[in-house]
């Protein structure tokens, strides 16, 4: 337990600790396919439909950094809808989003002891009011184009689109060490903490091509992350007031935080949001997914495949995405 009144951690200081534990935390609670947001201070850049692009290092830098260190980095560049050409893409691109509550307590905790500055330090992380948001996309190849003025377009051959986001409504990170006063960061706002991507090829003039598999792609897992330029990047969501961070001084410091009440039986177990953008991409109706959200990864049933050649909507991203999500949801059929 933290003793006394802890010193407040800044977001930059908390990021230094987050980078030490994020991969282990996210894999333990959300499964191996989820990618941890690289920095808490930039977490809003990794929300639903955010686009990530590869960024090459300068040639002399690549020669000096062999192997993993010389690999291309990923950088968030904004939400997909704001990057599309308005003329020609209207009607071709559509998506709907759905939000799920956990199948149990909407709170997770993690604790680890590490050597920091030569002293053992206990790291405690608590995340509360967890949610999962999923976007179902209709993105027919060859019919949707990116804006020609995007500075990174000429050197980009594929993009990553965030289609699944795990977020929390509050986060608390505490550090306890015998060599220093306890330190604490508590954020009282919605914050993405992990995400999953789809990869799409880019054809000439920024036209989006077909979806590409991620099975042999080393990215986005283990990527070197480039911090976004928040002054020029289109916002993904309204930014929270800075008071959200500084208000932590008025928040009682005990860890863990008050538990989130478990979800009640009844309508509260249903998805809390189901919205369409653009024309309805599911005119046939998708397969029915239950609202059970399991944090531990599960294997798909034997023989489960994506959209096949007999699927008339196989060109779109909606049905393959639904098939890909079958490993995390139980079917009601």
From Swiss-Prot:
Pfam families attached to this UniProt entry: DUF4663
Gene: C11orf42
Biased composition (Polar residues): 324-333
Transmembrane regions: none
Sequence ranges of Pro residues compositional bias: 251-265
Predominant location category: other
Record localization: Cell projection, Cilium, Flagellum
Designated name of the protein: Uncharacterized protein C11orf42
Stored InterPro entries: DUF4663
GO annotations of cellular component type: sperm flagellum
Region listing for Disordered, in residue ranges: 234-333
Keyword line: Cell projection, Cilium, Flagellum
Provenance organism: Homo sapiens
């Amino acid at each position: 337990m933290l003793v006394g009144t802890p010193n407040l951690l800044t977001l930059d200081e908390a990021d230094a600790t987050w980078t030490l534990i994020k991969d282990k935390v996210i894999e333990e609670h959300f499964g191996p396919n989820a990618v941890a947001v690289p920095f808490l201070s930039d977490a809003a850049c990794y929300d639903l439909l955010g686009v990530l692009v590869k960024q090459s290092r300068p040639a002399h830098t690549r020669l000096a950094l062999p192997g993993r260190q010389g690999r291309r980095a990923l950088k968030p560049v904004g939400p997909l809808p704001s990057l599309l050409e308005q003329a020609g893409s209207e009607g071709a691109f559509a998506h709907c989003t759905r939000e799920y509550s956990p199948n149990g307590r909407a709170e997770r905790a993690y604790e680890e002891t590490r050597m920091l500055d030569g002293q053992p330090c206990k790291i405690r992380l608590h995340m509360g009011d967890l949610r999962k948001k999923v976007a179902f996309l209709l993105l027919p190849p060859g019919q949707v184009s990116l804006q020609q003025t995007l500075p990174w377009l000429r050197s980009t051959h594929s993009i990553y689109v965030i289609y699944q986001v795990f977020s929390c409504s509050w986060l608390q990170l505490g550090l306890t060490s015998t060599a220093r006063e306890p330190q604490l960061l508590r954020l009282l706002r919605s914050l993405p903490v992990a995400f999953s991507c789809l990869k799409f090829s880019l054809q000439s003039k920024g036209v989006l091509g077909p979806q590409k598999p991620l099975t042999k792609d080393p990215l986005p897992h283990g990527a070197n992350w480039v911090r976004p330029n928040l002054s020029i990047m289109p916002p993904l969501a309204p930014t929270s007031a800075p008071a959200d961070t500084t208000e932590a001084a008025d928040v009682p410091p005990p860890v863990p935080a008050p538990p989130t009440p478990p979800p009640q039986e009844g309508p509260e177990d249903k998805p809390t949001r189901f919205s369409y953008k653009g024309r309805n991409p599911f005119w046939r109706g998708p397969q029915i997914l239950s609202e059970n959200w399991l944090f531990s990864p599960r294997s798909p049933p034997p023989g489960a495949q994506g959209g096949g050649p007999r699927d008339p909507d196989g060109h779109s991203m909606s049905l393959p995405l639904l098939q890909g999500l079958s490993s995390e949801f139980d079917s009601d059929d």
